[in-house]
Amino acid sequence: MSTSVLPVAWRNPDAPHVLDNAAWAALTGPHARFAERVGHAARYPLDVSPFTALADPSDPRAWDDLAALVGPGTVTPVSGATVPPAGWETVRSGQGVQLVATALHSEPAPEAVRLGPGDVPEMLELIAETEPGPFLPRTVELGTYLGIRHRGRLIAMAGERLRPPGWTEISAVCTHPDHRGRGLATRLVRAVAAGIRERGDIPFLHTAAGNTTAIRLYESIGFTLSRRTESVRVRTPDRRQEQTAGPCRCDA
């Protein structure tokens, strides 16, 4: 068993940190091989992850690059942004929390099995049943995913998603409703964290701000609330409609 211990003041709240823009840091770092990028905007392939990120959400040039990347009239999520520029439509907004492993005991789970592409149909079925967050046909390529089976059926899983330099996000933590209350999710989180720490990274994770049950669980096993996060789902300006409409004529 190993323990991830960070000092109480593990970051300076007045200075930028790689986790402040984790998706961008991952797409321009360890996950650069997945990145579809135009200038200051990047995203994962649509069958890998829904994450879209901007180098600086306050920079209008980054939004122009995003429009070029995803195309006109396209709905896309944007991490770390709250209000899009004029001409963009906000479809939905959401708040989350980010937690960092400051005192997490990590250890392998002997009953856990490594999940791969051949397990994706079962993984997608479990995700649909439990709704822990986005998981797509190629999400399994982002890192290590572990699962626990009961009589051959996948009943719990957890794995790795974002990988900003020095950090790895634990994601897709879920247990089938018929098997909850047995500590399966906790064992898988510890096991995934053990692999993360073996390569020298620090585990972190995200959850919805309103998911107080999950937040309390993660805090109880050694995660500390790091920051609140914002995201928006936006529709890019449809320049095609503007071009079709043409200039307005106002004859007196």
Residue ranges and their predicted role:
Residues 170, 203-207:
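Conserved hydrophobic beta-strand within the GNAT/NAT acetyltransferase core sheet
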Residues 89-101, 206, 224-238:
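Conserved catalytic-core motifs of GNAT/GCN5-like acyltransferases
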Residues 134-144, 148-176:
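A conserved beta-strand-loop-helix scaffold within acyl/acetyltransferase catalytic domains
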Residues 2-19, 102-133, 242-252:
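Short amphipathic alpha-helix that is part of the acyltransferase structural core
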Residues 1-84:
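N-terminal charged segments
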Residues 61-66, 181-198, 215-220:
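Conserved acetyl-CoA-binding loop-helix of GNAT-fold acetyltransferases
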Residues 83-88, 186, 209-227:
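Conserved active-site alpha-helix within GNAT-family acetyltransferase domains
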Residues 52-58, 173-180, 208:
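A short, internal acetyl-CoA/4′-phosphopantetheine-binding micro-motif in the GNAT/acyltransferase core
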